[in-house]
Each structure stands twice: as C-alpha cells, then as structure tokens.
Amino acid sequence: MLASLTMHVFPVEDAILPPTMGHYVYAAFLDILRQVDAEVAKQLHLDHPNKPFTVSPLQGKFNKRGKGKLFVRAGTECWARFTILDDNLLSTAAKFFLEGKSSLVRLGNNVFQITRVSTNGNGANGNWSACTTFEEILDCASLFDKLSLRFYSPTAFKVRDRTTGDTQNYVFPDPLYCFQSWSRKWNALSPIPIDEDALLDFVQRHIRFSKYAIKTRIMNFGGYKQLGFVGDCDYQFVDSISAGGQDRINKRAQEHLKQANALANFAFYCGTGYKTTMGMGQTRRQKLIGTGEI
C-alpha cells in the first residue's frame, strides 16, 4: 500500500519558525513512529538511499517576522504531508493516530495540536491525500506521450562527476535524472520490478522538453543550505513513439511508455531527487487539457 496522509495542525501558542521546515516535519514524523515502535524509528533514521517515506514542508498562512523567520499565530491551521511506501511503516503510523497516542507534535521548539489526519481522496484537484498500490499504479498507467509535472518544493539531484568522482547537486529537471530517481525508488520498494536500464535508454532516446518554467529556491536547514528548482515542466516522447498513433506502437515501446507514465504518477508518492525525507522534491503530475489524463 502507498499512502499520502495530510496532517492538519495548529500552534498551541504563537510560533516563530524558520522559512525551511522540512527537517522539522521529518523529526516530527520520526517522533510519531517512535511513540509506537522505537526500533522502526531508529531504522528509518539510519542513512540509506531509498527510505520508504517522504515529508512536505509545513504549509499554512505565515507572516514574515524579522530576518529569515516566520510568525504563525496561535490557532492558525497548518498542514504537512507524509507519504508512506511500506505496509509495515504505514501500520506503525496508523497506530499512532488511531489509538490516540498523542494529539500533540513538536516542530522545533513549538508545540502543535493535531486536529485531523486526512487519508481519503484521490490526489486530484489539489487534494494531497490519496492511497493506492504499486500494482494499481502500473495497471492503470496510460500510454500518453505527453507528461506535465509540477515541482512544488525545491528539487535537486546528487550526481557524481565522472572525472573527479566528486558529487555535486544538479538543479534542473533533466528527464533522465527524474526517471532515474523514480525508477530506483520503485525498484527498491515495489514487488514489481522495472528494467531500469532499458527504461532509461528509452527515455534518453525519445523524450524531449516541450516547455518548462522553473525558478531556483534555497532551503535553509539551519546548519547548511540547499539549492533546488521549483516550477512546471512538460515532456514529450517523440520519434517512433508518436509515429502512426498508439495502435501501431511496437510492443516493447508500448511497455516502456506505460512504465514511464506509471513512474510519472508514482512521483506523487516518492518525490523527486535528493532529500525527499526533508521536504525537498515534492512532485505531482498535472492534468493536460483535453486528454482526460489524471
């Protein structure tokens, strides 16, 4: 089961917060798990590349206060999103909310009251709550040759320089890096593997930018800063993919196109790129007018 949960909260007292709060939501999520099963929280905190969850930054109506701070008045509703891509982890998180372990969470030095947790919805029309399965994502994937995505929080890819071996952050929605990010997370967590090399070769040969409108943004995590991009990007598969219409696409290309559509939908749950557990890379596919697409 894949789940996207939105947790609605308000500060018990007036709160002063930093502009970047993904790491606070990350800490709050681990604390929620810790109250149910300390070992689960401990294992998630260990450094491994494909953790089965993401968090969003805190969302709400904030006012600037001083240099680099945000003011939230007591009682102001805010929300944050967790996506969970593992059945055992989902069961642990559900116990916290269903068994009433606590109605309070701490974000930094501030205490927030939980008012509700939304689990229903289909992720459409701006709704960030949804649930599905890996099987359903793949079975329901379309054969659209156009993909439109929006990157809501700063997104970056950690790439290695082939000459020096050094890693650096890449802040552009290169489709190959996007699909590499999604396919690696898929194969790490899904019971239905995708041939990553074949898919990425397909993407590299056939995908092009239709248009993009992005900006760079900085996330300040306190001890360090991270640059990323936000905005919209449209991709299109071209050449042999579109020639002759969908009825004449060869079987292998059809399979890859279906997988590409599935992964674009999967991005809603897995995020994109680097530090998705700290609020970066929040991504969702956008509806293309006149296609009936999601």
Go through the PLM ranges and name each one:
Residues 1-294:
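RNA-interacting cores
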